[in-house]
Regions:
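Extended, compositionally biased low-complexity polar/Lys-Gly-rich tracts
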Residues: 6, 75-79, 351-352, 484
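Membrane-interfacial loop-to-transmembrane alpha-helix junctions, especially the N-terminal start
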Residues: 17-25
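N-terminal secretory/membrane-targeting segments
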Residues: 25-190, 213-231, 262-269, 392, ...
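Single conserved hydrophobic/aromatic residue that forms the stacking wall/gate
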Residues: 1-9, 14
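Solvent-exposed soluble domains appended to multi-pass membrane proteins
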Residues: 178-188, 195-198, 203-553
């Protein structure tokens, strides 16, 4: 309220018009409230200050969603208009001298700045405003909403700027990393590495409600067969129903937490390049989405192909939502086959676009669930059927890819993983109707909310070249540990940071942004002191590596 009153006062001093002061002061907060409301409905998380960096990305996908004008929105709209009318009719226009006007503006600015830096950024005050008796303290969304919209948004502004982990000392972090020497990939083991992050890829047969349906079990059976011939497990992501680059960049950098990168960054892409690899990136979507065109350059990729620079000639962006995996697999195979013996080794990474939400709730093209069989609404059944139809196609194409790789004499290892659970209705309505537990304070709810599949597959030539079996349970890990897991299965040591990761992963394979760790197989926020110290050292070393770019290893 202090900030809002200061803005109103400033506008009064500038314009002498109460209605204009109200309108220009209320409109930003009204817009923020609506944006946060709909983001929670569509994505399951509120608007934070860091989202301002992604306004263009958000604008590009808004047309895909349906914005329901609900009763709360109508009430807020009516209140906004009513207050504007009252300010026009009941508040008098006051003339002010230039000196009074300037003094008023300076006073309001002083109040605004004082309130922000003394109150809104205070962690202690923020903790004191907790409403844990009324909400689930483990739900970041409920914690945010319980404080309104303006206050938590302004409090999040400081998160736009990097803040070191608790107990961070640069000299200590540097010393931690210096304990590990970078190790090269042996020349005779520099095989082709292919990585594919699959859009909203999730094994919904993990839910008993769907696993008891034979059509759903049959759909996922080819995936399970492929997993049985690979190293496989669950990826415990930081995100739900969106925010795909969190998982993507976690894999490519090894960082357990990160924002959008703004300059050259140490990454595993650069490690591959230092080892003499060519690093290529492929995505059938737009390059501006999540600012990938710039970020991929910061990560160190040699070449990137997006919709605008290649895929658009093969498939329209509209069709890419439904059937671009076939095109993507063909493109990747061509990348592999066009190499010659004189070319460098290849790191080929791609992000799929097929099956990006939302999914239609009005009609469907393939039938897996029906209201008659499940008791669920037709709208929910449509969403589920349309999602599963896309998954069926994706699984078919990934199996085709593995067959093609197996037929080649070139040694190739492939890592597949999902970025996040799929969108399933505004406010996760479809999950709720199915009875899926999304309470992350429980082990079951945490997995239901955050887990996606991953697998590491190698063709016969790669198994022979590396002397590894590439089969078995890979365990459940955070995205930041997936590249390390890939290197471990290949028998490679990796750089110094990866070696630190491997030691940390042995203690807790989960490094979640919200502080969750996995200790002796249990997910917990109550971390034993010895594990907490290992995590602190890891986070400090990670922060140091992120902040100190080294162009060449």
């Amino acid at each position: 309220y202090e900030i809002r009153l200061s803005l109103v006062g400033s506008e009064m001093c500038i314009r002498d018009r109460p209605w204009a002061a109200y309108l220009l002061s209320a409109l930003p907060f009204f817009t923020l409230a609506l944006a946060s409301y709909y983001k929670v409905q569509l994505r399951g998380d509120p608007v934070l200050a860091t989202d301002l960096r992604l306004i263009r990305t958000a604008g590009g996908i808004m047309g895909n969603y349906t914005f329901e004008i609900s009763a709360p929105v109508i009430v807020v709209l009516e209140g906004f208009v009513l207050m504007l009318v009252l300010s026009c009719l009941m508040l008098r226009k006051e003339r002010m001298s230039p000196r009074s006007r300037l003094a008023g503006i300076m006073l309001m600015l002083s109040v605004t700045l004082a309130c922000y830096f003394e109150l809104y950024t205070s962690s202690s005050i923020y903790k004191e405003t907790a409403n844990n008796d009324l909400i689930s303290p483990w739900s970041a969304v409920e914690v945010y909403i319980s404080r309104g919209t303006t206050y938590p948004f302004l409090h999040s502004v400081q998160d736009m700027f990097p803040e070191p982990p608790e107990g961070y000392r640069e000299s200590e972090a540097k010393q931690i990393l210096e304990q590990y020497a970078d190790t090269d990939i042996p020349d005779d083991q520099k095989i082709t590495v292919v990585g594919i992050m699959l859009e909203a890829f999730s094994d919904l047969s993990d839910f008993p409600q769907l696993n008891e349906i034979s059509a759903v079990r049959n759909l996922y059976e080819p995936l399970h067969e492929l997993e049985s011939r690979s190293v496989s497990g669950n990826l415990l992501t930081n995100i739900f129903a969106g925010g795909t680059t969190n998982t993507e960049w976690g894999f490519l950098t090894g960082y357990s937490q990160h924002e959008e990168f703004r300059g050259p960054i140490n990454s595993y892409v650069r490690y591959f390049k230092d080892q003499g690899y060519d690093a290529l990136y492929r995505h059938p979507g737009y390059s501006w989405f999540y600012n990938r065109s710039n970020v991929n350059e910061y990560l160190g990729f040699d070449e990137c192909v997006f919709n605008e620079s290649g895929f658009g000639d093969l498939i329209s962006i509209e069709d890419a939502l439904f059937k671009s995996d076939t095109v993507l697999v063909d493109y990747l195979l061509n990348d592999i086959d066009s190499r010659t013996e004189d070319d460098d080794s290849l790191f080929l990474f791609s992000v799929s676009y097929q099956n990006h939400g939302p999914y239609s709730s009005e009609t469907y093209w393939e039938e897996y669930v029906t209201p008659a069989k499940t008791g669920w609404s037709m709208e929910s059944c449509c969403v589920i059927n349309n999602y599963l139809a896309g998954i069926r196609s994706t699984i078919e194409q990934m199996r085709r890819l593995t067959r093609e790789l197996e037929a080649r004499d070139e040694p190739i290892v492939l890592v597949l993983f999902g970025d996040h659970k799929p969108w399933m209705g505004n406010g996760s309505s479809v999950y709720a109707e199915m009875g899926v537990d999304l309470d992350v304070s429980t082990q079951e709810g945490f997995y239901n909310y955050f887990s996606t599949p991953y697998l590491i597959y190698a063709n016969k030539a790669a198994k022979e070249s590396l002397g590894q079996d590439f089969r078995g349970d890979g365990g459940d890990i955070s995205p930041c540990f997936l590249m390390d897991k890939l290197f471990f299965e290949c028998g490679w040591t990796g750089d110094g940071f990866m070696q630190l990761q491997r030691e940390t992963r042995a203690v807790t394979p989960l490094m979640h942004e919200d502080g969750y760790r996995m200790v002796d197989g249990s997910i917990t926020l109550d971390v034993p002191p010895d594990v907490a110290e290992i995590c602190r050292r890891y986070l400090c070393a990670q922060y140091y590596r992120e902040q100190h770019f080294v162009s060449e290893s």
